Amino acid sequence: MPRKGAVAKREVLPDPIYNSKLVTRLINRLMLDGKRGTASKILYQAFDIIKEQTGNEPLDVFEEAMKNIMPVLEVKARRVGGSNYQVPIEVRPDRRTTLGLRWLVQYSRLRGEHTMSERLAKEIMDAANNTGAAVKKREDTHKMADANRAFAHYRW
């Protein structure tokens, strides 16, 4: 526990093109070694691919994808009387978004398409259609929470 109290949350500035804080957070999540320009280029190219292939507004597709990826429940290990229980808990809204973005980028990187922008675009489109690895991760998380519902009374 920190002695000086909780660290204040930094306000994220919306990105200049789509004017969305969620897009900025995705750029930050994509960024490697502080190369924000490269991360921005990858994301905007992915959005161009989405617009080209779906004909819809890329930001709407992305927000729909995020809605389908963000988990509502997760399990947390609690030690009670010498044994560990996986206790299902509700996910806070800020953590929901963070997990959604993390899974989106993680499973985009594992895909087989040629460029990262293609991988990201395909994963976003899959997530918007309720398919893809990131949505599967959310479903697995929910299944795990559902399977451990018996331990829900250990929540505190």
UniProtKB/Swiss-Prot annotation:
GO molecular function, one term: rRNA binding
Keywords on record: Ribonucleoprotein, Ribosomal protein, RNA-binding, rRNA-binding, tRNA-binding
Pfam families listed in its UniProt record: Ribosomal_S7
PROSITE patterns: RIBOSOMAL_S7
Disulfide bond entries: none
Top-level division of the source organism's lineage: Bacteria
GO CC annotation terms, alphabetical: small ribosomal subunit
UniProt xrefs under SUPFAM superfamilies: Ribosomal protein S7
Keyword Protein transport: no
HAMAP family reported for this sequence: Ribosomal_uS7_B (MF_00480_B)
Subunit architecture: Part of the 30S ribosomal subunit. Contacts proteins S9 and S11.
Family according to the record: Belongs to the universal ribosomal protein uS7 family.
Function: One of the primary rRNA binding proteins, it binds directly to 16S rRNA where it nucleates assembly of the head domain of the 30S subunit. Is located at the subunit interface close to the decoding center, probably blocks exit of the E-site tRNA.
Record-given protein name: Small ribosomal subunit protein uS7
Gene (UniProt): rpsG
